[in-house]
Swiss-Prot record:
Induction: By salt and drougt stresses, H(2)O(2), salicylic acid (SA) and abscisic acid (ABA).
Record's miscellaneous remark: Plants overexpressing VTE1 show increased tolerance to salt stress with reduced H(2)O(2) levels. Plants silencing VTE1 show enhanced sensitivity to salt stress with increased H(2)O(2) levels.
UniProt GO BP: response to oxidative stress; response to salt stress; vitamin E biosynthetic process
Protein name, per record: Probable tocopherol cyclase, chloroplastic
InterPro entries referenced in this protein's UniProt entry, alphabetically: Tocopherol_cyclase
Keyword rRNA-binding appears in the UniProt entry: no
Residue stretch of the organelle transit peptide: 1-61
A GO MF term: tocopherol cyclase activity
Gene this chain is encoded by: VTE1
Taxonomic lineage: Eukaryota, Viridiplantae, Streptophyta, Embryophyta, Tracheophyta
Keywords assigned: Chloroplast, Plastid, Transit peptide
Start-end of Low complexity biased regions: 32-48
Free-text tissue specificity from the UniProt record: Expressed in the roots, stems, leaves and spikelets.
Pfam families per record: Tocopherol_cycl
Any GO CC annotation of this UniProt entry: plastoglobule
Length: 470
């Protein structure tokens, strides 16, 4: 969809501070240094974000875009991640939202604890922003949270504006600003909000406030751009089989707008962006993650996501350690997953990520490093709620190489050789006393089942009958 042609510019009544110099990204070029001038310049003017209501049957929509909560009392969380990277000033902003046990919208009463046992409840909004600084706002209540059953649309009101009624769905930007003092709303093509740090994270460098408005044009979902988009974890993700489930919603997009970070304004045009989500009873026991949308050495938009973890399968105490590498380049999707090949990893407790993968036709190698100390981020856990559980940086140095696979299994023609100094890197869970090295070890029966091509969405032609989230 041509977002600019379908929407009107949004007016901003608040006076804006001088913007950080982040010039329009009209042509790919070498990455700018991390330090950047704060003085405005006529040559760095950017386009305003534009708003359009989320269309039905939009292109590049992935399965599992919707909110998966089914209304039952089972332990449940859902989390969302949206990232914008600004190459011109080498800064990234990672927005993370979570809801825990939403059955208990006003928190748990004593009677609830007697019946269901103690649970952690609430809604959290976190941002890892410029210079790896952090902000977090949390409430134990989810009564002002909303999520669309079948589309990537959600929001929450922490504090309504002048006694206004909090929105219960997507609203135009001006209406949101008039009704919500502190909160957020996000769709596949629009994102806005304002949050204030609640003081619970003094152990990391903080900012006190963040405000943002930007529009997004999706470029990649999860699959070839001309094909039906894929479920990241296969068709079994439609059922509560894995703990947790995971879906990349937008492997790559281009975002335009502004972010005010503790009063400093960052403006951007066609900035690379990304979104993903997970849901279930709790996070994996241990995991690693690599993601990057800003590269040198390749033309067009390149998107990389690689991750692995130790997660529970089924109802028993069986665990598996799957790994995945997904690359979008020149409109094509290159997938390295357990049910079509192998993925190997060698991950240090911090500072070094090395992965390789192969499938029937291709080979890939990834190596990423960082000298940054990293910032502790929160994740929903069954044991303690939304607590520090992982460490991230957006200043990773990364090299991505991919080849065609020869008949003898060796490296053939090189398809991609690209580098970045803006990779997002993460390790989480634990323990991480030592490095973690291995090759994909997944249950053979599960691999055979997951690898079977099943279009789950086509089994539910009537939207009302589709499982939540699908």
């Amino acid at each position: 969809m041509d977002l600019a042609a379908a929407a009107v510019a949004v007016s901003f009544p608040r006076p804006a501070p001088p913007p950080r110099r982040c010039a329009p990204r009209r042509h790919r070029r070498a990455l700018a240094p991390r330090a950047a001038s704060s003085s405005p310049s006529p040559s760095t003017a950017v386009a305003a974000p534009v708003y359009a209501p989320t269309p039905r049957d939009r292109a590049l929509r992935t399965p599992h875009s919707g909110y998966h909560y089914d209304g039952t009392a089972r332990p449940f969380f859902e989390g969302w991640y949206f990232k914008v990277s600004i190459p011109e000033c080498r800064q990234s902003f990672c927005f993370m939202y979570s809801v825990e046990n939403p059955l208990f919208r006003d928190g748990m009463s004593d009677l609830d604890r007697v019946i269901h046992g103690s649970r952690f409840t609430g809604v959290g909004a976190q941002i890892l922003g410029a210079d790896d600084k952090y902000i977090c706002q949390f409430t134990e209540k989810s009564n002002n949270f909303w999520g669309s059953r079948h589309e990537l649309m959600l929001g929450n009101t922490f504090i309504p504006n002048n006694g206004s009624t909090p929105p219960e769905g997507e609203v135009p930007p001006q209406e949101f600003s008039s009704r919500v003092l502190e909160g957020f709303q996000v769709t596949p093509i629009w994102h806005q909000g304002f949050i204030r740090d609640d003081g619970r994270s003094k152990y990391v460098p903080n900012v006190q406030t963040a405000r943002w408005e930007y529009s997004t044009r999706p470029v990649y979902g999860w699959g070839d751009v001309t094909s039906k988009q894929k479920s990241t974890a296969g068709w079994l993700a439609a059922f509560p089989f894995f703990e947790p489930h995971w879906q990349i919603c937008m492997a790559g997009g281009l975002s335009t707008g502004w972010i005010e970070w503790d009063g400093e304004r960052f403006e951007f045009e066609n900035a690379p962006s990304y979104s993903e989500k997970n849901w279930g009873a709790g996070f994996p026991r241990k995991w690693y993650w690599v993601q990057c949308n800003v590269f040198s050495g390749a033309s067009g938009e390149v998107a990389l996501t690689a991750a692995g973890g130790l997660r529970k399968i089924g109802l028993g105490e069986t665990y598996e350690s799957p790994s995945l590498i997904g690359i979008h380049y020149e409109g094509k999707f290159y997938e390295f997953v357990p049910w079509t090949g192998t993925v190997s990893w060698d991950i240090a407790p911090w500072g070094h990520w090395k992965l390789s993968g192969e499938n029937k036709n291709h080979l890939v190698e990834i190596e990423a490093t960082t000298k940054e100390p990293g910032t502790a981020l929160r994740a929903p856990t069954m044991e303690a709620g939304l607590v520090p559980a992982c460490k991230d940086t957006c200043y990773g140095d990364l090299r991505l190489q991919m080849w065609e696979k020869r008949n003898d299994g060796g490296k053939g023609k090189m398809i991609l050789d690209a580098t970045s100094n803006m990779a997002a890197l993460e390790v989480g869970g634990g323990p991480w006393f030592n490095g973690w090295k291995g090759t994909t070890v997944s249950n053979e029966i599960v691999n055979n089942v997951v690898g079977t091509q099943v279009d789950v969405e086509s089994l539910f032609p009537i939207p009302f009958l589709k499982p939540p989230g699908l």
